[in-house]
């Protein structure tokens, strides 16, 4: 598993999802070994329900061991995403 894994939960008609995607994509570009997995909540409804995803966008940040270290509903900024990544690297 990557040192930091970002999961982005989106939907097709979610305006803020574009902002969230841009912020997370920039963070992945800046963090060596980071990865991004995007989930469409319509096509992956079971996973969204299992992880208690209630709104889009939702960003989940996981450490290298797979533990969730941060979750945010809404569109985060790049500095917020980088701060969350720092938590994942410390975990």
Spans of features found by a protein language model:
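Local sequence-structure signature of Cys/Sec-based thiol-disulfide redox active-site neighborhoods
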Residues: 1-31
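Chalcogenol-based redox active-site neighborhoods
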Residues: 9, 33, 50-51, 76-79, ...
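Thiol-based oxidoreductase modules, predominantly thioredoxin-like and allied folds used
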Residues: 9, 32-46
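Short alpha-helical
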Residues: 15, 43-46, 76-79
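Short, well-ordered secondary-structure micro-motifs
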Residues: 19, 47-50
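Hydrophobic alpha-helical membrane segments, chiefly transmembrane helices and signal peptide h-regions
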Residues: 24, 60-61
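Structural micro-motif
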Residues: 51-60
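Non-catalytic, surface beta->alpha helical segment in thiol-disulfide oxidoreductase systems
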Residues: 61-91
């Amino acid at each position: 598993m990557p040192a930091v894994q970002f999961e982005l939960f989106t939907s097709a008609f979610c305006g803020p999802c574009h902002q969230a995607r841009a912020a997370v994509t920039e963070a992945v570009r800046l963090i060596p070994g980071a990865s991004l997995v995007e989930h469409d909540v319509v096509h992956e409804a079971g996973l969204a329900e299992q992880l208690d995803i209630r709104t889009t966008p939702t960003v989940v940040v996981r450490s290298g061991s797979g533990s969730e270290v941060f979750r945010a509903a809404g569109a985060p900024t790049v500095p917020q995403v980088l701060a969350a990544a720092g938590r994942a690297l410390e975990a």
